[in-house]
């Protein structure tokens, strides 16, 4: 199905976490009323009464005329032309469960950097298979863009990924802002998997820091992670792509180094000696790399690509292996 986004297309956002909130902020700043599915009663009440999300980015105040928060998923989706998914991947099915309105006449944009657990599918694959959308009706908004900086107007670079360049440009127009720069790509597979893999690699960096490894080693670890990511993409889905640009390498770097990185934080706790269970309990937000490590290992069983860093993270998270021992063994496999 050929789908063309119109100039007056209306947007709706599914989710109420930090990235969803930052996205709504960008859309609302363009003087377009944004539909917003918020299933948490406390958050919904606060958004309706004072224009703030009390749980995430609560210093961001919305003009209440620019947002239309609702707990009625069908109504939010029905009134939109572009539906933007911004939930943790582990909760996507739960968020969409109440939906009875068909998505087949919508354009769906995933802002999720994770795999749907249990289904072992990327969000793009899941929406295609379960909701009957053509891949030409599905896009991505991604890049090295922590919500905390985007919401505060820090210069950020986003990549819109879409099969149709005109649709990509239309999506970009809705996110446009003084401090937002855009690039465009048609590599749905590569960009989405890069955004998933970088979370696993950020976990490995956090573990290394927690164990006491220094900057010299981190540089080697991240360089090898970049190579491992490229190898996975080239061997699992060969295509002409430059993995040195921001949607691939840039997103990897910011997730590995940033103080805002949830995945680095989870790894840091484990490296400091926390059990995986206690580290997860201490996290206040979802670290996508935890779910991705298991999913990527399952997916890679088909491809049999050499991925020593991802394998190390999986062993620590799911096999109860010693982080110190696994990291030591990994050091001999890096170049």
Which role fits each region the language model picked out?
Residues 1-60, 66-71:
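NAD(P)+-binding Rossmann beta1-loop-alpha1 motif at the extreme N-terminus of oxidoreductases
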Residues 63, 69, 73-78, 82-153, ...:
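Rossmann-like NAD(P)(H) cofactor-binding subdomain of soluble oxidoreductases
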Residues 115-215:
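Rossmann-fold dinucleotide-binding core
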Residues 155-158, 189-234, 245-265:
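Active-site-proximal catalytic alpha-helix in oxidoreductases
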Residues 205-209, 234-335:
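NAD(P)-dependent Rossmann-like dehydrogenase/reductase catalytic/cofactor-binding core
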């Amino acid at each position: 199905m050929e789908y063309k986004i119109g100039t007056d297309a209306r947007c709706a956002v599914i989710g109420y976490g930090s990235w969803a909130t930052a996205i709504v902020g960008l859309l609302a700043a363009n003087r377009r009323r944004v539909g917003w599915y918020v299933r948490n009663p406390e958050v919904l009440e606060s958004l309706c009464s004072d224009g703030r999300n009390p749980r995430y980015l609560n210093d961001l105040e919305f003009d209440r005329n620019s947002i239309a928060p609702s707990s009625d998923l069908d109504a939010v989706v029905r009134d939109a032309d572009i539906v933007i998914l911004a939930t943790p991947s582990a909760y996507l099915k739960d968020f969409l469960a109440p939906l009875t309105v068909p998505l087949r006449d919508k354009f769906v944009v995933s802002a999720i950097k994770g795999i749907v657990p249990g289904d072992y599918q990327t969000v793009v694959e899941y929406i295609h298979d379960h909701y009957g959308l053509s891949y030409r009706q599905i896009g991505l908004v991604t890049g090295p863009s922590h919500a905390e900086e985007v919401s505060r107007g820090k210069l950020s670079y986003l990549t819109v990924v879409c099969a149709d360049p005109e649709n990509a440009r239309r999506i970009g127009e809705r996110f446009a802002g003084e401090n937002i720069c855009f690039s465009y790509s048609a590599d749905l597979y590569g960009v989405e998997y890069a955004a998933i893999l970088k979370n696993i690699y950020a976990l490995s960096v956090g573990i290394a820091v927690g164990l006491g490894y220094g900057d010299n080693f981190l540089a080697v670890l991240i360089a090898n992670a970049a190579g491992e990511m490229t190898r996975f993409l080239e061997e699992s889905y060969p295509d002409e792509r430059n993995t040195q640009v921001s949607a691939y390498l840039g997103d990897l770097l910011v997730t590995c180094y940033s103080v805002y990185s949830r995945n680095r934080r989870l790894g840091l706790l484990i490296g400091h000696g926390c059990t995986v269970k206690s580290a997860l309990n201490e996290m206040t937000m979802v670290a996508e790399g935890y779910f991705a490590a298991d999913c990527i290992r399952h997916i890679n069983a088909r491809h049999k690509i050499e991925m020593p860093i991802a394998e190390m993270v999986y062993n620590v998270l799911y096999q109860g292996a010693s982080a110190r021992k696994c990291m030591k063994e990994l050091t001999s496999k890096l170049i």
